[in-house]
Amino acid sequence: MDEKGILVAISGGSCSGKTTVAEMIYQLLSKKLKVAIICQDNYYKSYKNKPLLKRKTINFDHPDAFDWKLLRSHIEDLLNGSIVNVPLYDYINYTRAKKTAKIGPIDVVILEGLMPWFDEKLSRLSKLKIFIETNGEERLIRRIERDWQRGRNIDSIIKQWREIVAPMYEIFVEKMKRNADLILPWSQRREVSTSVLDVAIEHLFHKTVEKNN
């Protein structure tokens, strides 16, 4: 595949700060290149044929919850210079929304989520893999604040954390560090300047384009 763009992947536990880092990089890069952020959550399987109560019990922190085939296809299309209609996730109804977001053509795709390079093909396509490391206590506090704003009650948030989120982090998400190019502790995010990442990603993009021309 002659890539016209590059993929940067950002992994980390729930509420570790992945989106924040992705947006910081976007703000710098988008001044020079066409950049898009894609959230891996948008590629949860639809589960639209299951009733809402059943959808609420699904383990969304397990790799099997994602539509890897669709995600791979869309990433490959974007790296090829095409336009894709990215699905959007409805956090209230635990399924895909009816609307989609049109993205492309782009130079840099930032894919952020729990395990964006769990899939071998996506791992190979990723030019830079960044893992955001944040302690569990901080992540839980952020999770409670976030899900409370989404209308969840405290008991259900903590129950889900204990039974699903924390165990899945240990089994799957934390292992993403093994193949990460950069492990970024949240507490040191300001020492590891995003401007450095900006320069590195821009260099990777131009290097990839030159190689394929």
UniProtKB/Swiss-Prot annotation:
Catalytic activity: uridine + ATP = UMP + ADP + H(+); cytidine + ATP = CMP + ADP + H(+)
Record organism: Mycoplasma genitalium (strain ATCC 33530 / DSM 19775 / NCTC 10195 / G37) (Mycoplasmoides genitalium)
PANTHER family, A to Z: URIDINE KINASE
CDD domains reported in the protein's UniProt record: UMPK (cd02023)
Protein name: Uridine kinase
Sites where the protein binds ATP: G12, G13, S14, C15, S16, G17, K18, T19
GO BP term (any one): CTP salvage
Family: Belongs to the uridine kinase family.
Annotated HAMAP family: Uridine_kinase
